[in-house]
Amino acid sequence: MRDLTSATDSASLESDSSRNQFIINSLLPWYSCSEHEFPHRKARKRRSPKNLDWSVSVQMPLVTSKTKESEKSPKSWSAIAKKHVQGDSPVKKSHSVPVPSDRSEKKSFNSSLGELIETYSPSLDAPRPIQPRGFINTGNICFMNSILQALMYCVPFYNLLKQINRMVPYNFERTTPLIESLTMLSRDFREYSEKFDLQGDSILPEVVYSATKGNPRFEMLQTGEQEDAEEFLNLFLDELHEEFVRERRHYLLKNDERNPKSDIKISNGIKSGLDSFDDQSSVEASGWTEVGKNKKPVIARSATVERSPISQIFGGQLRSTLRVPSARDSVLLEPFQPLQLDIQAEDIHSVIDALEHMTAPEILPEWHSSKGNVTATKQMYIESLPPVLILHLKRFFYEASGGTQKNYKPIAYPARLSIPQNVFSPSVRGSIHPEYDLNAVVYHHGTSASGGHYTVDVQQLDKSGWFRIDDTHIHRVPIHDVENSELSADPSLSKLGHGDRVAYLLFYTRRS
């Protein structure tokens, strides 16, 4: 190493040129180029900052200036948070999930979900298979676990959740807690492009459980009481329906469109419709006139349900006809969800038997009319069927001597269900030929209506196989163990202590 204090170096420092050469050759050897070849950095004049106006509407594209650089989307979602909407309401915070790139406008949660509801049509297209995951039972919630599994493996319902995840930003205000909880739960089920054998880790459906807190409909979840799976399904779908209806109304009102008619709950709509047949005078009080059999005029009324994705997926319609001597026939169109099937009669041994029994005429003695008490008849037909047909096999009945009892009768149900034409109303008979594929079966184990245990068999979304799910226990089963499964002995059930299993809820999806 050179001695920087040598006499030679001291002399070289006396002149500027020598000093520069010394620095180049000794101290900074990487600056080895000559002075005239050295790439001097060009001086640039710093531009003065511009005051940008971020007061833009969420309905307009984000434009901050006229330069090409500013025409691009903001690089950070924090920049969007600095904006505010024209008017009184600020921009709502959104989840970290970005708005789809195919949309040129930034939409709020309400407008996005409302638009989706207004334009929604159920999709029967099979998605990719998902990895099965068990649900942890924290105590007497097997009824909820079984219903949630059946819904997750229902193709139109899963496609709906997937569509919401893709198109609607997260809502931090929790105005639709059940919708948001289900979309979040669906993200825990990973999709696969190839077949797989291993199941995912079991999870606690805490997000759904939390969404029910404070809702009086789901008080049984907070008290730890066992609940009937069919009753929970009805309450759950009703609440989902109402959340969708509220968002649709908000969207229509915001866009200055017509105000929808009053909402009628699906489960209550059926009951109120039947109660309206109490007497002939109430039947004739409202409704419209139809031309019935032999061109005889009939009074027709309808218990309508406001449209939502839930009613579009699961909701069907029944036609109930009341015939009273010396009076016009009365017709009531009633919604159903699910379809209740009585199986108590001795001649009912299959789902088809139960459907045909449902449409048999019912004798109503001592019917009160304007001409006194008469014998009337009431007959029920299917007017329309939904994409997903849920059949409730009414296993429990009441006896004055023994209270609520359970019917263990084996009921045959096929993997492919063809609805017979004689169960449809004459007005639609012959015009529709629906066929359904079985995709989930919810079972009840035990003797008590207020207790016991629930499990479920579900078909993979792409129809590649079946899984038997008992809370966190999952294993594959062949289709012949699912079809009419209560007629066959299953060794695994004996080991679990559930040898009294019977089918309780059947989920059928219409063939596309």
Swiss-Prot record:
Region of interest: Disordered: 64-109
Q: Which GO terms describe its biological process?
A: cytoplasm protein quality control by the ubiquitin-proteasome system; protein deubiquitination; regulation of protein stability; regulation of retrograde vesicle-mediated transport, Golgi to ER
Domain USP: start-end pairs: 133-511
Q: Which Gene3D superfamilies match?
A: Cysteine proteinases (3.90.70.10)
Keyword Protease on entry: yes
**Which Pfam families does the UniProt entry name for this protein?**
UCH
Do the record's keywords include Transport? no
- Residues of the active site: C142, H453
List the catalysed reactions. Answer: Thiol-dependent hydrolysis of ester, thioester, amide, peptide and isopeptide bonds formed by the C-terminal Gly of ubiquitin (a 76-residue protein attached to proteins as an intracellular targeting signal)
Q: Which CDD domains match?
A: Peptidase_C19
Q: Which UniProt keywords apply?
A: Hydrolase, Protease, Thiol protease, Ubl conjugation pathway
Q: Which InterPro entries match?
A: Papain-like_cys_pep_sf, Peptidase_C19, Peptidase_C19_UCH, USP_CS, USP_dom
Instruction: Fetch the SUPFAM superfamilies from UniProt.
Output: Cysteine proteinases (SSF54001)
Q: Name one GO cellular component term.
A: cytoplasm
User: Which enzyme class?
Assistant: hydrolase
Documented EC number(s): 3.4.19.12
> Where on the tree of life does the source sit, at the highest rank?
Eukaryota
GO terms for molecular function, please?
cysteine-type deubiquitinase activity; metal-dependent deubiquitinase activity
Family, per entry: Belongs to the peptidase C19 family.
Protein name, as recorded: Probable ubiquitin carboxyl-terminal hydrolase 3
The species this protein belongs to is Schizosaccharomyces pombe (strain 972 / ATCC 24843)
Q: Quick one: which gene encodes this?
A: ubp3
